[in-house]
Amino acid sequence: MQNDEEPAAAAGTSGLSNGESLRSPPAPAPRRPKPGILRLDIGKPRRSSGGSVDFRCVGSSSSNGNTSNVATGANSENNSGVTSPHQLSVTWAPPCDLDRGGWQMQSSADAKREFYKGQRGRRAASQEDHRSYELNDFPLQNQSSDAESCHQEPHFAHQRSPGIGFDEDGGGGDIDDEESYTISVSAIMQRRASVRGYRGKRGSRSSRRASSPMDHVLDSVERRRSSVYTTSSEEGTNQESTQEQIFENIRLHKEVIQSVKLQPWPIRKKLKLVRQAKTYVARHEGALQERFAMSRSTRDLWARFKILMAARWRHWKRETASFLTVLIPWELRIKEIESHFGSGVASYFTFLRWLMWVNIMIAIPLVAFVIGPEYFATKHGETDPRKRMSDPEARVAGNLFTFWEFEGYLKYSPMFYGYYSSTSGISTSGYKLPLAYFLTAVLVYIYSFVATLRKMAENSRNSKLSSKDDECVFSWKLFTGWDFMIGHAETAHNRIASVVVGFKEALLEEAEKKKDNRNWRVILQRILVNILVMGLLGLSGATVVLLVNHSEDLAKHDNWLSRNAVNVTMTLLSFFLPMIFEALGLFENWHPRQQLRLQLARIMILNMLNLYSLMFSFIYKINSKEKPLQMLKLENETNTMELKNLLSSIEALRAMTPTTSLYGESTSDGLFDDSTSTATWGEDGGGLFSTTAAAALISTTVQRLKCYNMTVKCSKLRRNIISGKHLATTLMVLNLTTPAMVPPTLPTTLPTTFPTTLPTTLPTTLPTALPTTLPTTLPTTLPSTLATTTATTSSIWSTTEETSPTTTTTSPWTTLPPSTTTTEATTTTERATTTTEATSTTTLKITTAEINSTLSDTTKPLGKSIDTEIPNSTTNSATLSTIPATLNTTNLPLNSTTKLTTTTSTEKPQGEDNFIYTTGEDEGSYDYGSDSTSDAPDNNSYSDITDYSSEPSEIEDFDEQESTDQADDPLAKVLEQLDENETKGRRKRALAESPFFTSKYSRRHRNESAVSAGQPRETTESVNATPSRWPFNWASFRQTTPRTTTTRRVPSGILTKEEWERLRRLRGRITTTTSTSTTSTTTRRPRWRYRTTTTELTSTTEEESSTTESSTDSSSPGSTTNAFDSSSSTTEEDEYTTTEGSENRPYYVGYVDISEMGSTIYYDGDSEFLEECVITICPKGDDFFGSTTESPDSTTQSSDSKQLTTVKLTPLERKQKRLKEVQLAIKQIQTNLTTMCWETSLGQELSKVIVFDGLMSIVAPLCIDFLRALFVRYVNQNWCWDMEKTFPQYGDFKIAENILTLINNQGQVWMGIFFSPGLVLINLVKLMIMMYFRSWIVLTCNVPHEVVFKASKSNNFYLSLLLTMLFLCVLPVGYAIVWLRPSWHCGPFSEYNRIAEFITNTTRNALPKQLHEPLDYLTSSSTVIPLLLLLILIIYYLVSLTGALREANQDLRTQLQKEREEERKKIFKVPEVKQAEPTATTLTNRWRKVLEASSPVTPTQPPDFDTEEYKNQARKELISRIMKKALRKGSATSDEDSFVRRDDDDTDTEHQDSLPHDEEAKDKRFGLSRLQQIRRTRKPSLVDIVQIAKQERARAGSIVAGTSSSGTGNFPIKETHPKSRFKVEKHERKDRGSMKDKKDTRHRQSPQQQQQPPPYESPKDNEHDPDTNSRIVSASLLRRHKEQAEGEEPPTTPDAPQTPNSPVEPVEQALEESTPETPTLAKSKFHIVDEKKPPPHEVEDKPLPTPKESGSGGGSLGKFKFRKHKFKSNNVAAVKPEPEVFKFDERSVERSSDVPATHAAEYLNNEPSGTEEQDRSLPSPTPSQGQGHHQRQLSVLSRQGRKKIGNLLALVREAVNLKKDDVEQAGSDESPGPTTPTYLAYTPPPPPSVLSSVSSSTALEMPPTPEPESPTPSAPLHFGSSTSSRAPSKPPKPPMVPASATAPTATMDDLEELDTAGPITFPRRSDSHRRRTMRQDSQSSIWSDNIPTITISTTGSDECIVDAAAPQNGLPDPRSASPEPTVNIIRIDIENEHEK
């Protein structure tokens, strides 16, 4: 909270922010004094806050209401004790004339300004002032000048008197103020002279404190000041000097204006001073300007201009600064929340605001470099499918659900990855969008890391800077907690709430430190809770994974919940599980902050689990989408190529319609028939058709041509017969359908192979494999595809090929293959081949059937190929497995399984491919299958297809003209050759396909090779080609083109069998295994990869198929080659004559091979050797169709019935018809592609999660907080229980959940930013909405947490969670960039295999080649691993260094603290007295003195020092103690405390959190006996032991005596903290031994004594240790007197009236025992509990008190936890009145404690009640009051230290003398108010050990002024409670020994006091202290500044620090009763209080 931070500010600042200071004295109108914001009574003295500095003039001390003597400025400053003179640029005039008004100037500038304003009228005065300033006699000059100015001012001010005579109140107040003003001004001047000396005008200006808020004011007078100022005298006739003086005075006044606000005066006084100074400044500035105006010199004009400009500039600067503070978003809102709910809740909002800044910074580069350019560069009518939605989408784009799903307009917007393109938009203008996209994303992630780390480092620094906060937590809070600039009631209310909450936080910290965490029950609970939490986390992760895996099934249910199951579930999990975690966390019993952190960590793990489950399941889905995507790509490319070819061929056909028709009928048909033929040939020689791809394409073509070619073995020329045009057309079709592979091969291959193969195969295989098979197999393999295919096939067969394409298309939609299949199916329909086409698989199967026969021979060799193939085309086989099975079944008989499989496979593979493609028919399917097998293969397939097309198609495709030409007969020839060569020379595509080209892209090569193998059937190749990326394909194509050309040449030239074989072998294909066609294929394949691979590819296409298709596939490879070379033939040949095939292949006589293939049986050598001639038979087309059609039903035969009308169509019609189909297919592909962009879909999912989460974060609070609050608020009145207090209550703000929601939300944004750049903008809107909504909910419906705790100051815990989240969220993005293949149809990286490839290639291209190798080396593991090791070592080193520096820092801090202590001691050191040192000698001397002085028992050694010496010592120690406390150096701030806190909270928590009693060490010291203390520091010396023994004896004697001995025991030995500790240790030791015995007695006594001591202490805030000492010294006397006085106590009651003076003591008491002190402290807050036996002791004490009220008072002190003096003799001591050195004014105690002057009996009652009251009072309100009171007292003490000490000593003296009797009586009578007894010493001092335990008693060794004079003191001692801690202020006690006054430190109460030297009479305290050491110390220290004995126990444990002050009379009975020290604790239950 601010409170905590403010203390960190220099003590000089009273907690005002600079901004406020800027705004404070309204600078805007410096000329006109304005009324102040707060109006306070000027007359009313105001205490300075701890942080303020008092500048006192000697005479003015009264003005402050402080009685401190301000003899000199230095003294006054010292007295203030808050700021050192150098902290302020202005020094308040120390000695000032009273006339001047003992002003303590706050800011010289301000004061002067006001002062001068007051003097506005008199320049002369100002001059005088200047003069005076110049003179070093500041006080006099100032006074004179001020006086003069005032006199001169009359016109300006009411008074002529001291310059500030404008007291609004007027009259004396004015005079006082004026005096103060003049004094302040003079002080300022003096300070300036002394500190700065008067330097030249410029110099002085520059010397001004740069930080001063009024810099501008001073600067305004940027006048040249020459030494003249200082030198000029009086008005100085010299105008220049006057000007300079005026400048100087103006500057000084401005400085006064600046620093006034730091003063502790009443606000009215400050305002008046400021107004006067401003008036002066305004007037004199105006005068100067007038003077300048009269002067015409350039210099004056320039000066005038400068003045004007300076004023304007200052004004503008300040206005700007004020305006900027308003611009900080939500600052005021957050401050308001902080004041009501604590820093923990506010930390959420500051964190949210910081996150918003980070998001803005992330959004800027994204918008500037990615979103903006692409959006603005996109034209309105963009045709790019990435930027334009399809018609179906456009129709629903405006629906709400469409927006909710981020579809429609949002999907086609720059928000998502898919919108960006490297080919359209800004890229067309030369902007490298992919590079910009990638680099911006990297920049965003780097910035996120850097911003988070910078913030963490900054927070660490800040928390280090505030480390001193842990020194005096409570004083800082109390003294500097208020903001004096507050001018609004509501704000003041907030501030009060904030201060209270701050105290609660600090107290909680203290309480938590006392907890014992080692408890088996707690440990077990924690273990159980953690097990449960882990189980819940595992369940949530499993739920998300399960949901994502089934999301597709769920999406089929068309309802909102099913579609959004994933994000709804994630939101619900993140909503409910944290609640469960929170409930479980309650069982763990952690500190609220620790519990919060655990909760945060658990929720963090939960969110990360859910997020990661989501990401990984998405990645699996993405992987599953990849194959269909590649199929679609292949199909798309095939169709695109076909479209291109169709267009060109249509043009060609139109040009040559007649020929074309004929050809179309015959050659074309032949060509097509080759494809189509397959069906027909399927009947005849299915072999031709075997090339499914070709068949498919051809069938399509045939459908168009309506005729099929019959393959007959003939010379190779025959192949040429196929008209080039038809071939071209076919090839084009094939290209379009498949990547044009089919056309080239098909015409040749189909006719050749299919004729033979098809018929046989069709019937046999086809039924199974083809339509039938397709249905059968496909259904199995490709249920959807097959079904489609089958249906298509059937319809196609019966209907038209068109249908089939459509159907196919549908299937392909499922997977691309189907579309291909459709084409093929269509082909099949058109011809019998349709079967092949539609189910190329089928056709192949037909081929297989034939091939089975033929292949039977060949199949086996093929089988090997196939087998090889199959592995490659695993996918296909899997896909086609069904088909293969069917085929196998059908074919098996024919071939060996292998052969049959091979044949079947060929067909099947196409089907499979189709299947994989879903419909890719033979060609498409097959290719797809191959592709399918491996994505790369797909790509390869695609390439292959391309090659296929390429040959015919590439020529046609690539070279449409060529294709067209080839369409002519030459083309047909080429195509035929290609078909045969196609295997080799499907080249164009094959090129892509070709092994060599393939090798380029290994995956593609594999695919391509597979494709080649399978592709020989063009389909496969097409497929393969398609699979290969277009880029690759095209490259391949291009390369292929040459290759194709080569291939074509080869086809034309026809490779020799040897060449083919060689090629095939190169491929590693089973050339031999496969027939020649296979070989050809193989050869071709081999180029690709392997003959086997080819086979495999085929096989791949139809993985299983490959088996079946071995021949086909093999043959596919060969056959494919054949198919392309001679499709069917190849298949069969492969199977049946690998050798033959090889031979043919060399020729790559597609037709021959095909014909051979066609005649499945003949393939062996003949088919391959002979070229097949294709005879176009239209009727057969029917057969073909029939066979195809039937083939689904009846294998092949339906081809007859199937005659397609297509056959009758002219080639042109067919092409046009096909064109429509292709266009439709392409459209369907595009439709399918719209949902296939995985990057966009991932971005959409994350966007939905974020938006849904945002909605939940609004809806949930509305229901959970708002509606509940309404219900509770308005229904509570009529409810049967109190809903506000019990259930359901008002909601509180769940910090952990809300913080984690923010972090999780930001993690999702980071994860999605790469896939959805627009996500940041959505998140920004969400964050702003959440800020407003959440802050409204918090302020409206929430209540602060019951347990308020401080947020870690740095909030680094939140940031570390954020950093972890950032790191974890970058990992999936990195994975996607490096490992996942980007979608090929969307996004800027669609052309690359991997997104990372892009950046690699870009880098390589940008760098010269010479650097490539070094780069490769640098990025290799040989460099990276050593680098990582090096970094790890560096990190280790830095971590070690940090640890060492932290330790050094700690040591330095300790050293500083010690030095500070020493300085303070010197400052407060009384010149005559030398500070007591903890050395053994000093201790010895002190003990000796104590024993001699106070103990009648040990009068042995007369004190070496006179009573005066003792007094001096006591005084000295008291002063040092006061200093410590004032500066908060005391116990709370002890090093140990700081250390603890630092180590614990370091950067995360505020050091201020710890309470003073945190320091166990100190507490321990207090609790320790003297010997123990000595041992801590050194080895106890013999002297120590002797002294201790004497003390013990003395104590025992005192206990026994009960009178003087107690005095002796109490006899304060002045000790510094260390000594006190030693005493405590000794005391404890003694306590353990004799104390136990004495304890009871002591308990009785100590309660009384303690009661008295606290009051006594309270007066001095434990700093009255001297009093305690005095008490101790005179304890014995007091005891005697007490016994006597018990009766007299009632008289003491009158002393109570002095309570006002003694309030401090009472306060302490109140803190210690609220009873006595309640008046001051609002007793209710602090309960005094006897630690050991609080109630019993109280009771005991009470009884004892009854006899001796003071004793009872002691008892209450005992409760205070003052060590109960173990003076069993206390009773005796009580009997002995002599030692009663101090007796607290029991009355005051009573008054303060609520138990007013209760008699002994009453006291007994009251005391307990006091305790109770204190418990009640413990509520922070009282503590704060007490604290405030005490702090004020403290400040007074610090200021008036000497006076107070003197007074206190006097009081102690009085108390000792006068109060002996009174105290005794008062103690017994007033026991209720025992706290009042200032004379702690009164408590029968225990033997030295007691003293030691009382350590604070050390301070004053008062010669026991046994005289009853002390009685008076009882009242005076009370002074602490009502009075500021100036106990001494009670002069009535002057009789008390001054030393005793010092002694009175409420040692018992304030551990600090105990620490400090001074007689502390808490004998009992030793043990209790030991127990309570920590708590007491820190607690007491908390209030120690001014609250002597109050122990604040957050835990509320009895171990409060409140040890009874030294038993006053030492009613020994209560204490004595129990030998063990009874600790009376004041327990302040803050929580209880709050509840109350």
From Swiss-Prot:
Cytoplasmic side: 1-353, 419-432, 548-567, 621-1308, 1380-1423
InterPro entries: TMC, TMC_dom
Keyword Nucleotidyltransferase in annotation: no
A molecular function (GO) term: mechanosensitive monoatomic ion channel activity
Region: Disordered, residue numbers: 1-178, 194-243, 789-839, 860-967, 996-1027, 1066-1143, 1186-1205, 1527-1572, 1592-1841, 1859-1990
Low complexity bias locations: 58-73, 886-906, 1069-1083, 1091-1100, 1107-1130, 1890-1899
Metal-binding as UniProt keyword: no
Biased composition regions of type Basic and acidic residues, renumbered to the chain: 125-134, 216-225, 1538-1566, 1614-1640, 1658-1668, 1727-1743, 1777-1793
Disruption phenotype: Viable and appear morphologically normal. Adults display a significant reduction in the electrophysiological responses of multi-dendritic neurons of the labellum (md-L) to mechanical stimuli. Adults are unable to discriminate between the preferred softness (1% agarose) or smoothness (sucrose solution only) from harder or stickier food options. Adult females display a reduced ability to discriminate between small differences in egg-laying substrate stiffness. Larvae display abnormal locomotion behaviors that likely result from the loss of proprioceptive feedback.
This protein's UniProt keywords: Cell membrane, Cell projection, Ion channel, Ion transport, Membrane, Transmembrane, Transmembrane helix, Transport
Transmembrane segments: 354-374, 396-418, 433-453, 527-547, 568-588, 600-620, 1309-1329, 1359-1379, 1424-1444
UniProt feature, compositional bias: Basic residues: 198-208
Regions of this protein lying in the Extracellular compartment: 375-395, 454-526, 589-599, 1330-1358, 1445-2036
Feature: compositional bias, Polar residues: 74-90, 227-243, 870-885, 933-952, 1806-1838, 1976-1990
Sequence ranges of Pro residues compositional bias: 1903-1914
Subcellular location: Cell membrane; Cell projection, Dendrite
Tissue: Expressed in multi-dendritic neurons of the labellum (md-L), which extend elaborate dendritic arbors innervating the bases of taste hairs (at protein level). In larvae, expressed in class I and class II dendritic arborization (da) neurons and bipolar dendrite (bd) neurons (at protein level). In adults, expressed in various sensory neurons including those in the mouth parts, olfactory neurons in the antenna, wing bristle neurons, haltere neurons, arista neurons, and many other sensory neurons, including a subset of chordotonal (Cho) neurons.
Family of this protein: Belongs to the TMC family.
PANTHER family documented for this protein: TRANSMEMBRANE CHANNEL-LIKE PROTEIN, TRANSMEMBRANE CHANNEL-RELATED
Protein's job: Probable ion channel. Component of mechanosensitive neurons that participates in proprioception, sensing food texture, and directing egg-laying site selection (oviposition). Component of multi-dendritic neurons of the labellum (md-L) where it is required for sensing the hardness and viscosity of their food, enabling them to behaviorally discriminate their preferred softness and smoothness from harder and stickier food options.
Designated name of the protein: Transmembrane channel-like protein
Native organism: Drosophila melanogaster (Fruit fly)
